[in-house]
Amino acid sequence: MSSSQTRFLLLYGSQRGQAKAIAEEIAVKASDHGFAAEVSCLSEEEKYNLERERSPVVIVVSTTGDGEPPDTAINFVKKIKTKTLCSVHFAHLHYALLGLGDSNYSNFCNCGKTIDKRLGELGAQQFYASGYADDGVGLELVVEPWIEGLWDALRKFVTSAMSTSQKDTNNHVGDHNAKNEMRTIESAVTDLNLHLLSLDESSSKDESGGSCNIVAEGEVLEASLTRSVSPLSESSLNVPALPAPFLDVELLNELQQDPTLLKPPETAHQVVITSAKQLTREDAVKTTLLLEMDISETPLVYEPGDSFDLLCPNNNSEVEELLLRLGILEKKHHIVKLQVKPDTKRKVSRLPLYIPEHSSLQYIFMWCLEIRAIPKKAFLRSLVEYTTNEHEKRRLQELCSKQGFADYNHFIRNPSLSILDLLCAFPSCMPTLSVILEHLPKLQPRSYSAASSIYSNPGRVHIVFNIVEFPPCPERPALRKGVCTGWLSNLVLPILQHSGGQMMLPEIQDASNVLPKVYICSRPSSAFHLPSDTAAPIIMVGPGTGISPFIGFLQHRKKQREEHPDVSFGETWLFFGCRHKDRDFIFRDELGRFQAEGTLTHLRVSFSRDQDDSTEEVKPKYVQDNLRLNAQDVVRVLFKENGYIYICGDAKNMAKNVHEELIDIFSRELQIDKLEAMKVIADLREKKRYLQDIWS
């Protein structure tokens, strides 16, 4: 650290690397503004001590699951929530916090808000207003202006602290000035966020989502991924600083063994897929598969409500297409040697830990890199330097600029474009391998809820999923399947049993030699489990594949009832929904059996596409409609009988709609206003009686 640079502590808590990447970006930019960031993960408690920290502290933290801290922040949150800490425990601490979340989830940025609130309760003071970035609309809309404002806030704080120290200013006056500065900063951030919001709203007024110019009478020129129109095409641009390169890449000799064999982490276990069944009819809108995996030879155990991370590769043809586009396909079997550039200007630079040594080029692109990741603006800024066509170079500059944020969202973020899509759209762009490796994030495992109970299926676990499809669009003309679901559907094709049909394995001595194998890791849930009190009633809301954990719940409850006939068991309500009764009513027969034997006491099903317009009878279309029709029972179960409600499925639409419907139900049935109803839900959450397993 230069003697002229002012130190601050930079902490991050990250689940999938976004908070870490943003913290590293802040650290890189710090030196340009006269600061030196000392970076640590929140889990690295041996590297920092907030009890003794006198420098400013900046915290970047994400939220995972149903408002839970990322794994790397769990101990930190638990530590600061210790009830024995006094109200001035952190009175010496001055901090700024940037929270990352997704507004598709009801507990938006909950980890960041929890840390923020608790630090305040312990006497810590903000020197800069907290920012909460929304991945649902684009993290950069808040992250970029928040980082820009951070440097002035740090300078003001350092100047104020030095002035206070030198003049021994009266504490009351100092507090008053600090509050005024805080209001000024909060006002500036609020104004900036409102400005961004107004820009975003105005840019979306055109139905196409982009701008358009009238070139001649009757002819309209519209913006596209590769073309801009006025005013953007004529604007001066504020583009991000060019990220400093930090990797040296060398291709060595060819790898002799199979270059695509996975080198699994220690926590992963290889398991055999013993069966695969299609649960939906061939004419269903989505294809749903159920897989059974044999975990009997592993130490893995689980409870209904837990999940499993499944390690999956990128599509091989997609990998080869990308390598071909980069001009290195013929070297796909060569070993890649990585080193940090000795002369890099990047302050925080290290080799990617997710790329093993002595890996082939093909292996790295198949198993290590998220090649489907939406390229961030910093990536686009780097691509500009490798683009020779002036028109293409200008367009990439626009897409990564402040002025082009609406076009970036509309043409890159919303259609979920990948680096391959961009390189196909901008043919004169020829980035080096090092640039690709520097910017592509780690390929993440995909998480699936257990759709079974280990007590009903010893040594086995079931998962259920839809085969995800991304339809063609102007920016990506070819249909694509989900990275994991597309791979799994091809992997199990030889053993797939279609709905209503039978699948016969070949007569062989050892079926495990021909059955497909995958690597999985256990991902226990902290709370999404059946109540320990079997007499407590439960309400389960799970349309589509959201029913998965509830099949495990019901299998588990059935086994409990069989083994403990004298024990009291509470009501079980299931609200399920799908499009068509005859096409995608998955687990229909099993639910019928659960009902017949009394394990499932109430089943309410809605079919969104089977509405009969010829009759006046209005049938429930979605799960929230059935909740409304059973409002009195919902209130009785939750409040008179202290029951639990579980919600599983799509966060963006279903979970939000169910949440809003419950607010209406509580308001109406309990005769309270909506604000009080929201507090009621918050109380249920706090007591772990309103639980969600949702995804976007």
Give the positions of each predicted feature.
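FNR-like FAD-binding dehydrogenase module
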Residues: 1-696
